[in-house]
């Protein structure tokens, strides 16, 4: 019984420290990709300069482990290692797949009283392309309790056969995204 009481007291103390640290300032929410966002959707927010965040997330049978680092005041990058279960796209990737990927996100401008924060980003452009996407996103706060995010995404963030990707001015590979995956990862992928 005494062991149980000690465990309960330690758990309550740890919980109190967590609540206290969250109350000191608004915590940045991180998505299942380990980047500022909500669930799967990125926001135009960035971390504080020099911040480093490690995350682990599970979504069904899939797992993602990420390290996000704020390189410059407006630029962050993310290294991610994912375990994706039961892929049956082609013979090479049948079954469980382990994917390494890299993301980059650049905040073009900060939020003001009248204008939302605005950012552009690319997910999984150094990897197999399983999670690849590109996006524009805007985020605006209304008071201290409401934040609205909207954007436009391609690749994994969009459906098929929608309008053309503006990143296609950089490479034709952004115009047509294959239904499978590209290679085994570790190479620069732009579409």
Where are these regions (language model features)?
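Short aromatic-enriched loop/helix-cap "lid" or pocket-rim segments at secondary-structure transitions
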Residues: 163
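Cleavable N-terminal export/targeting peptides
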Residues: 1-32
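Transmembrane beta-barrel domains of Gram-negative outer membranes and organellar outer membranes
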Residues: 25-133, 139-146, 150, 154-159, ...
């Amino acid at each position: 019984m005494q062991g149980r009481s000690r465990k309960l007291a330690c758990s309550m103390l740890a919980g109190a420290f967590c609540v206290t640290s969250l109350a000191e300032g608004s915590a940045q929410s991180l998505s299942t990709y380990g980047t500022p966002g909500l669930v799967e959707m990125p926001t135009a927010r960035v971390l504080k300069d020099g911040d480093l965040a490690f995350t682990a997330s599970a979504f069904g049978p899939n797992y993602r482990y990420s390290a996000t680092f704020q390189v410059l005041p407006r630029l962050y990058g993310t290294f991610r290692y994912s375990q994706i279960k039961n892929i049956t796209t082609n013979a090479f990737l049948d079954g469980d797949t382990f994917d390494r990927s890299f993301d980059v996100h650049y905040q073009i401008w900060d939020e003001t009283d009248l204008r939302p924060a605005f950012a552009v980003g690319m997910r999984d452009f150094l990897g197999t392309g399983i999670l690849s996407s590109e996006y524009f996103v805007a985020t605006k706060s209304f008071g201290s309790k409401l934040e609205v995010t909207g954007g436009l995404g391609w690749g994994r963030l969009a459906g098929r056969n929608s309008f053309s990707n503006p990143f296609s001015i950089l490479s034709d590979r952004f115009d047509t995204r294959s239904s499978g995956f590209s290679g085994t990862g570790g190479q620069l992928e732009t579409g």
